[in-house]
Amino acid sequence: MRELIWLDFRLSIVVGVVAPLILLGWAWLSKKSAIYNILTTYWSVSSLLGITIFLLIGSLPIAFLVGWLARIIIPLSLWWWEDLNEELMKQRGLIRSVFLPWRWGISFYFAVGTLLGTFFLPCAFTPTTEFGANCKAVLEVPLLFKEIVFYSIPIPNLTAFGIAMLVVFMLFFASYLIFTFPEQGRFYKRKAST
């Protein structure tokens, strides 16, 4: 299981961070607004995975649930907007030819990750002191990340940062669902056309 966890980490860096960062810059430079808007939504939602890393550094059980939910909502954010998808289909160029396979690939990657993540969901409801081998194996990656990037910052500070960012994310997400969501996307388009 450890090998699978480390493989997931490596893949997430390449397909979940590096590739969309390059695509975002490319979309901005080439002024492809549909791709740019889809990717800014992706980055907003995928920040939940970054928050998960900070929660895992603190060995908080809720991190397992947060990470699993992130793997569900991230692909949704890539496909949800009908207007952007329609605009994307009208666009031409190399970036579109790169973006579309990446979007399918990352969606497949997160679908598989969601299925595999169900094996770790029990960790979300287990006290830290009773973590089994699988739960502890998941913690290895964030703890190594902490040692490399945040070696001088105490774990409680990073954990508090993760909790604060989760609260901020939840407030923004709730605000979006209550105020913005009804006025945009699929439901707004249907309502406007009737």
What are these regions (language model features)?
Residues 1-20, 156-163:
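Hydrophobic transmembrane alpha-helical segments in integral membrane proteins
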Residues 1-6, 25-35:
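Short juxtamembrane and helix-loop transition motifs at transmembrane-helix boundaries
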Residues 15-32, 174-177:
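N-terminal signal-anchor/start-transfer transmembrane helix
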Residues 20-25, 46-55:
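Hydrophobic, membrane-inserted alpha-helices
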Residues 31, 56-64:
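Membrane-interface helix caps and helix-loop-helix hairpins in membrane proteins
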Residues 34-43:
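Membrane-interfacial loop-to-transmembrane alpha-helix junctions, especially the N-terminal start
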Residues 49, 64-135:
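Membrane-proximal helix-loop-helix units in multi-pass membrane proteins
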Residues 104-194:
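C-terminal membrane-adjacent module
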